[in-house]
C-alpha cells in the first residue's frame, strides 16, 4: 500500500495505489515533484487551485502519459456507481466525509457483500488501511454525481507540462490581484469564509505544503505568518477589512518570491526541453 506523505494528498496517494496495482512502484511525493506540482496554479471559475487540489485526468496525465498510462474518468449517477465498480477494479473515487470535503479511496473488489477500498492515509494514522462498506453505507457517502477514475495502458507520449507551467505565473498574479482587492475592502463573514477556500487556500494551505515539499523554507515561513494572522479574523465571524490586521506587504512579497520561482522553472523547461 502507498501512503499519503504530504497534506491533502489522498488523490495522489490514490494514483500511486492504482499504479501499484499495475506493478509501478511510486510514491505520491515522487509523482508531485516529477510533474512540478509545487509550481502549478490553475483557475476553475471563481476558484483558484494549487498543489494537491490539482487532480483528475488533466493533471494526473502529466505523470501518466510519459510512462504509458492514461487516466480515464467516468461520470456516473449515484445509483450507477455500485454496479459499475463491480466490473472495474481498481478504481478511484471520492467519498463525502463532511459537507465541505471528500476523501479519495481506491476500490479493489467485493467481499461478503461489501465493497472494499484502500483508504489512502498517512502511514502513522490510526485509521484502517482498508474500508469495507455495504452498498447502503457506500451510497450514503456519494454525491449525486460521482467521478470514477481508472487507468488504461497506452503507448508512452509527451505530457502537456510545458503548457500547464506556462500558464501558472499569470494565474498566480491574477490570484494576487484578487486577494489584494478582497483584503482592502470590508467583507462579510460569509464572503470571508468563501474566500478562505477559493482565494487563500492555494497559497496559505496548499502553497505552504508545496513549498515544504521543495524544502523551500523562507517563503513557506512568511506564508505561515500571514495564515496565523488571517485565520483568527475569519473564525471571529465579523465584518472586517482584512488588510487592517494582516501583513499584506509580507503576503505580496511572498507571492512575488513564489512567482519568481515559477518563472525560473518555466525558463529551465524551455531551455532544456525537460519533460516528465
Functional labels for PLM-detected ranges:
Residues 7, 22-32, 68-122:
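Active-site-adjacent substructure of cysteine-protease-like catalytic cores
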Residues 1, 275-276:
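C-terminal end-of-chain micro-motif
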Residues 20-23, 39, 106, 122, ...:
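Low-complexity, compositionally biased segments
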Residues 18-22, 60-67, 84-85, 211, ...:
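Hydrophobic, Leu/Ile/Phe/Ala-enriched alpha-helical segments that form helix-helix packing faces
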Residues 1-73, 247-248:
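Cysteine-nucleophile protease catalytic domains, especially the papain-like/related folds used
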Residues 34-38, 79, 83, 270, ...:
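A sequence-level detector of short, solvent-exposed, charge-rich linear segments
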Residues 112-275:
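Noncatalytic regulatory segments and standalone regulatory/sensor domains
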Residues 47-99, 142-173:
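Predominantly the structural core of cysteine protease catalytic domains
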Amino acid at each position: 500500500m502507498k501512503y499519503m506523505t504530504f497534506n491533502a494528498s489522498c488523490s495522489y496517494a490514490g494514483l500511486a495505489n492504482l499504479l501499484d496495482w499495475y506493478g509501478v512502484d511510486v510514491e505520491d511525493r515522487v509523482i508531485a515533484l516529477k510533474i512540478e506540482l509545487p509550481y502549478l496554479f490553475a483557475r476553475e471559475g471563481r476558484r483558484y487551485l494549487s498543489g494537491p487540489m490539482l487532480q483528475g485526468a488533466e493533471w494526473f496525465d502529466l505523470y501518466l502519459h510519459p510512462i504509458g498510462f492514461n487516466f480515464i474518468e467516468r461520470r456516473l449517477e449515484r445509483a450507477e456507481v455500485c454496479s459499475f465498480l463491480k466490473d472495474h477494479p481498481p478504481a478511484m473515487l471520492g467519498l463525502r466525509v463532511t459537507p465541505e470535503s471528500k476523501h479519495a479511496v481506491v476500490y479493489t473488489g467485493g467481499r461478503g457483500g461489501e465493497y472494499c477500498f484502500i483508504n489512502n492515509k498517512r502511514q502513522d494514522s490510526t485509521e484502517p488501511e482498508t474500508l469495507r462498506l455495504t452498498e447502503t453505507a457506500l451510497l450514503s457517502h456519494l454525491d449525486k454525481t460521482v467521478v470514477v477514475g481508472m487507468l488504461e495502458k497506452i503507448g508512452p507520449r509527451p505530457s502537456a507540462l510545458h503548457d500547464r507551467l506556462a500558464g501558472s505565473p499569470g494565474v498566480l498574479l491574477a490570484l494576487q490581484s484578487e486577494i489584494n482587492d478582497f483584503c482592502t475592502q470590508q467583507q462579510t463573514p460569509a464572503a470571508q469564509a468563501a474566500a478562505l477556500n477559493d482565494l487563500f487556500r492555494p497559497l496559505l494551505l496548499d502553497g505552504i505544503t508545496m513549498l515544504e515539499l521543495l524544502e523551500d523554507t523562507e517563503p513557506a515561513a512568511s506564508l505561515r505568518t500571514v495564515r496565523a494572522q488571517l485565520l483568527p479574523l475569519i473564525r471571529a465571524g465579523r465584518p472586517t477589512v482584512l488588510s487592517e490586521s494582516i501583513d499584506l506587504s509580507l503576503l505580496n512579497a511572498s507571492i512575488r518570491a513564489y512567482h519568481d520561482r515559477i518563472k525560473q522553472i518555466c525558463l529551465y523547461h524551455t531551455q532544456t526541453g525537460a519533460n516528465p
